[in-house]
UniProtKB/Swiss-Prot annotation:
The lineage of its organism: Eukaryota, Metazoa, Chordata, Craniata, Vertebrata. One of its GO terms (molecular function) is proton-transporting ATP synthase activity, rotational mechanism. The chain crosses the membrane at residues 8-24. Keywords: Acetylation, ATP synthesis, CF(0), Hydrogen ion transport, Ion transport, Membrane, Mitochondrion, Transmembrane, Transmembrane helix, Transport. The keyword Acetylation applies. Its main location: mitochondrion. It is a single-pass membrane protein. Belongs to the ATPase protein 8 family. This is ATP synthase F(0) complex subunit 8. It holds the Pfam family ATP-synt_8. It comes from Pan paniscus (Pygmy chimpanzee). Subunit 8, of the mitochondrial membrane ATP synthase complex (F(1)F(0) ATP synthase or Complex V) that produces ATP from ADP in the presence of a proton gradient across the membrane which is generated by electron transport complexes of the respiratory chain. ATP synthase complex consist of a soluble F(1) head domain - the catalytic core - and a membrane F(1) domain - the membrane proton channel. These two domains are linked by a central stalk rotating inside the F(1) region and a stationary peripheral stalk.
Length: 68
């Protein structure tokens, strides 16, 4: 049974890998990637909150030092 000659394998595999790498790079160079989405400006709505003045009033009274 004849032996398999493996001496030429590195000279065959190395150019093949280089060619595959170059083809992949060229394909990636020609492909279009989407840009990251830009942030959409948010419009803040002011809702009528009846508890807000009361709550801030209570908090501000507690945070004040005691009056003498």
């Amino acid at each position: 049974m004849p032996q398999l000659n493996t001496a030429v394998w590195p000279t065959t595999i190395t150019p093949m890998l280089l060619t595959l790498f170059l083809i992949t790079q060229l394909k990636m160079l020609n492909s279009n990637y989407h840009l990251p989405p830009s942030p959409k400006p948010m419009k803040m709505k002011n809702y009528n909150k009846p508890w807000e003045p009361k709550w801030t009033k209570i908090c501000s009274l507690h945070s004040l030092p005691p009056q003498s």
